[in-house]
Each structure stands twice: as structure tokens, then as C-alpha cells.
């Protein structure tokens, strides 16, 4: 209601943050958030299915949710959760997303913590390598969103140069202040 009459859109997340909901639940969530006013939908893939090689399931799910979005004029962003994936998984996901002509491919939720050999949890988020890979393999009409660990202006600029058309960031104020100090307008 506050944004009515502006060009600011609303994005809602489904299957968040683990992506483990069934396809039917994700489609129902998609339909509901669009009815509620979302113009973009961020959907977390079923990472377990991707890691297990259940590519037909992953493809069918992405298609079903993208179809629901497109039919209602919304844009789908498919979140890969790259911290859990190997390059071969990212390649396959880009192929699937290109096949279904999704609006965006996106690196992370921000919750993709993994346990390292020392028993500590770590998080990588968006990397220059993964952004370049996703840009190279995605349909030219598909945008790439870098999300996760974009906390500085320098990292933002690296992500943009690598091919990200959008960056999710929690340190926006700091980045804007740094940009202003550097003379960006």
C-alpha cells in the first residue's frame, strides 16, 4: 500500500531458505504471493534433488514455477545456493534455466553455511567465478543476480563487471557512502 503508484516492485520468496518444499507447495506459494502483489518471485531450488542428480525433478519444478509466474506477469529468480554446489551442478542449473527462459539466475539465499574441516561454519556467497560462469551459460535474456557476501563497494563493482545485473546487499548505506566518497553519482 505504501508503494502504490510508484515503480517499486515487491519480491517474495518461496521455498525459503532450504528449497525443500514440494513443487505443489512452491506453486501454491507462487500463486499466493503474486495475488498478494508480488511482481518478482525468488525460488530456492531443491538443493538435495540437484545434489542427488534428480535433474528431471529440478527441471519440472523450475518450469512449473516459471509458468505460474509468466502466466501472471511476474518474474522468477531461481536461487541456486552455490555454496552447496560443484561447478557441474551450476552448469546443469544454468542449462535448465535457459531451457525454461527464467528471468534471473541467482547465487545464494545468504543462509548457505557449510561446515569446514575444522568444524567451523563458513559462508562464501557470490563469487566472481560463479557470476562469470552463470552469465556465460545463461540465456542472453536471463539476468544474473549476485547475492550473499556483497558487503563492499569493491565487491559490488567486481560482481557487476563479472556480469551481474543485480546485487543483493545488506550494507547498502556503507556502499552508497563509499561511492559518494569516490565521486560516483
What are the roles of these predicted feature ranges?
Residues 1-144, 151-185:
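Alpha/beta enzyme core
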Amino acid at each position: 500500500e505504501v508503494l502504490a503508484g510508484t515503480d517499486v516492485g515487491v519480491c517474495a520468496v518461496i521455498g525459503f531458505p532450504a528449497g525443500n518444499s514440494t513443487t505443489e507447495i512452491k506453486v501454491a506459494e507462487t500463486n499466493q504471493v503474486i495475488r498478494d502483489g508480488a511482481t518478482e518471485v525468488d525460488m530456492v531450488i531443491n538443493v538435495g534433488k540437484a545434489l542427488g542428480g534428480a535433474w528431471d525433478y529440478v527441471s519440472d519444478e523450475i518450469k512449473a514455477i516459471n509458468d505460474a509466474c509468466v502466466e501472471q506477469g511476474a518474474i522468477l529468480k531461481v536461487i541456486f545456493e552455490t555454496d552447496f554446489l560443484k561447478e557441474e551442478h551450476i552448469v546443469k542449473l544454468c542449462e535448465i534455466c535457459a531451457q525454461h527462459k527464467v528471468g534471473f539466475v541467482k547465487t545464494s539465499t545468504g543462509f548457505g553455511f557449510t561446515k569446514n574441516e575444522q568444524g567451523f561454519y563458513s559462508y562464501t556467497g557470490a563469487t566472481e567465478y560463479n557470476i562469470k560462469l552463470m552469465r556465460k551459460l545463461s540465456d542472453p535474456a536471463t539476468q544474473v543476480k549476485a547475492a550473499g557476501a556483497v558487503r563492499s563497494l569493491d565487491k559490488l563493482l567486481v560482481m557487476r563487471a563479472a556480469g551481474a545485473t543485480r546485487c543483493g546487499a545488506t550494507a547498502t548505506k556503507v556502499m552508497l557512502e563509499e561511492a559518494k566518497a569516490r565521486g560516483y553519482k
